[in-house]
């Protein structure tokens, strides 16, 4: 029983490697271009990211403040919104 299970797992492993190699060969140069494309996308997303305002930091809307903080409408600063958790 253990031997047949081991043989089955080995065959499945070989089939997985074979299918992966065939797919990699089919893609060709796409695989070579991917890292450069990912690097360019990384730069785009980093430029859009911005830090959140911490407690008592200046803000204009709630989304400026970090998690569990909200923008107070009168003095425009980030303060605890009364929530807990993640």
From Swiss-Prot:
Keyword annotations of the record: Disulfide bond, Ion channel impairing toxin, Knottin, Secreted, Signal, Toxin
Tissue: Expressed by the venom gland.
Signal peptide: 1-21
Subcellular location: Secreted
Major site of localization recorded for this protein: secreted
S-S bonds: 52-66, 59-71, 65-78
InterPro entries found in the cross-reference section: Huwentoxin-1
GO cellular component: extracellular region
Membrane-spanning parts: none
Role, per record: Probable ion channel inhibitor.
Domain remark from Swiss-Prot or TrEMBL: The presence of a 'disulfide through disulfide knot' structurally defines this protein as a knottin.
Name this protein carries in UniProt: Kappa-theraphotoxin-Cg1b
Native organism: Chilobrachys guangxiensis (Chinese earth tiger tarantula)
